């Protein structure tokens, strides 16, 4: 389960504790044991595949899966939600036109948390790293047509931007939530600026993410300093190539790179990068963070680095590019921000920080992470829920 899934699960558990009913509708992969109590998958692997084909050929992302979305509407007609909290509407599983038509017809209040920029563009989920501003006045001739959600044939970015603008600005009662100030400023420049925009930083469970025993890697790697990276799936935008290049820039006798997450076969990973398959256990993840000496985030763009916050909560200092909202996560004491994507500067920061007093640096990181507690996030969302549907 990724960070967005964990947020949804925590919100569902909170609502249940307060005496309300909540269901999580999701598109892909199996639910965990914990999330299965609340979750309902709305499409099959075959449905995801067909949606993917339409995306690859027709650039029809989020306008396929009509049958699956109609099946969702059948559930909603029975469930009769007082409020719908939207998260990611991309991912090969839903038809946004069908969904929004139902929401508008039934006048259901909406909170929409944006975890990227897809809702503002005709195609891509992020544009900041390539300096594109077409999304402000109208996408066309997309430079990232072959990036997620990739289209290998047609470029419908102009038409898709127009369709999304018409659909996404048609809600009667909606609040847009962003996890970072950085993303809220982008939303203010987009067609979504007709709605109220609220910043609610992602929160983490500080009862799970806290400094643990730090000896997980000592038997395997001895006294080497552990440089850690975590991602659900490693991609170019998540910095996989920079980690590969980092191997040759660090002294192998002093440093060991450890990456957690799915690494696709397309990438030739050096044998001296240690890979841990993606884990759904937050307890295991907290132990991994606690055993690292430095957490390195080399993403080209991040809305708000939730894994950065988790690492800090476990006492691990950060080295990261100043991409998107990452600087909001780290604050003044959580680590080092590299403003330009310069690997030499990353290496310098790693070498300087790796040999600082670990106890002192841990305390500073833990204090910074407390700003992003799960409880603060949940309370902010609950206040929004009450405001939109007027319940106590």
Give, region by region, the residue ranges found by the protein language model.
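Short alpha-helical donor nucleotide-sugar binding micro-motif in glycosyltransferases
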Residues: 287-292, 381
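Aromatic "clamp/platform" in nucleotide-sugar-dependent glycosyltransferases that forms part
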Residues: 300
